[in-house]
Amino acid sequence: MTKNYLFLLLGLLLAACSSDDKDEQPILVTNVVMPASGTVFKPGEKVTIMAKGFQDNDEIMFDIRWPLQDEVLHEGYAKGGRGVITEKTATSITFLAPGHWPASTTEILLCRSGQMMSLGKISVADGQAPKDFQLYGIINSRSNTDRPYAIEYINLEKPQTVEIVRLADNQDFSCVVNLPGSWSLSGVWTQDNRRTTGLYDLSMNYWEKTGADQLVTMGIATGNSVFGVYQGGDRLFVKTVNVMPYTRMYIPEKPDYGFLLPEGMKAEVLSRYPCIQMSDGNILCSADNGDGTFSPVVLNGQNMEEKSIYVGEPIQAVALIPFWIVKPVEGMGTAKYTRVGGYIVSKRNGATAEEGDGTEFRLWNPATKTLDEPFTTFSNAACSVATLVSEDFKKQELYVLFDGSRNGRLIYVYDLLKGSWESLYPGGGFPYSEI
């Protein structure tokens, strides 16, 4: 159903930008000069086409084709994606080569007021997302380092990190979530005291900053989508975020989920960590009370007609981080899994003889609205977490960023199936505040 729906959207988009005369293509520009033959563009690389007659409202669309090793279907294709235009004059148009697709021959279509003209074709290199799990580190205003704010790639095979993009002095990127397969990072983009949705496209290497102001935090929904939690007056609204800006497809927004804030609660207390959605529809958030305590906060998403916010008892802690894992559905063995949520409760950085480890990993019990007993602990205080669950469920891991005693922070991996911890890099030394 999902694939059919997307193809329908693409078809409607193309229909809206096609000539009424099927036999004759309109001449929208003249004297077209394409890039040199044989040039292969990287995804996100600037492409300039020269011609006479470009107009301010012109748009670029793509017809992307790539070969398939298939006896029936010899060619894969994607139609209808809109280009990211970076510069436009009366005699030239510059846009970013499309990403996220296999190496392709891409036809460039000029779209104007319901008419479409082919400008020519270019070759584009492979821009597909890696199949393996990818981990990224975020240096932002919460990082205890003098290094510039940036996004870095963390190599999981050997001790190596690579800077992906650096932020300007007046920019910040926080509450970052990574939807598997999208090859993009979504988070809260802060600039000039405005908090909006920021998305960094890892295939095309560019920023997309869209959405309304008053963004509180971000989260990943159970239906493989990203959502933002926005403030509107005395309510919180949950809105789906399009993590495929490179397609420029119109995807209708789902109805807003309006949650009335409890009396005395300000939305900004929920802005410390990303939130997560469980299979029951509820959304787990964390409230920083500003007095050395945190409170579990649950947005009740089970009944959209009676939306409510539950606030748990304050917990003395330095961190209360929502996380998710999967568990087998009762009575079905490992045939079916459900997503459950919980909180990482960090009371201090380090273990004590009297109280034990400083951090506990505890699942949330929706029935009792309390935290279960810890299923694992760690001595250091946690800062951030990322969950890996493979498609066959044979690999289930938590990647956790911990405070260190010196030389930066540590990343440890908890194997949920084996119940064991392992250091990602011996010695640590990471400058991140989020992973």
Regions found by a protein language model. Give the residues of each.
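Repeated scaffold domains used in trafficking and secretory/extracellular systems
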Residues: 169-182, 212-233, 262-279, 312-337, ...
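C-terminal motif of bacterial Sec signal peptides marking the signal peptidase cleavage site
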Residues: 13-16
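Blade-level signature of beta-propeller repeat domains, shared across WD40, Kelch, NHL, RCC1
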Residues: 403-435
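A short beta-strand motif characteristic of beta-propeller blades
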Residues: 160-168, 205-212, 216, 248-267, ...
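Beta-strand/beta-sandwich contexts
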Residues: 18-59, 68-79, 115-129
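Short loop/turn segments that connect beta-strands within beta-propeller blades
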Residues: 156-159, 201-205, 241-243, 251-254, ...
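An edge-strand/N-cap motif at the start of beta-rich repeat modules
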Residues: 77-82, 86, 122-165
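Structural motif
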Residues: 143-153, 192-199, 234-248, 290-298, ...
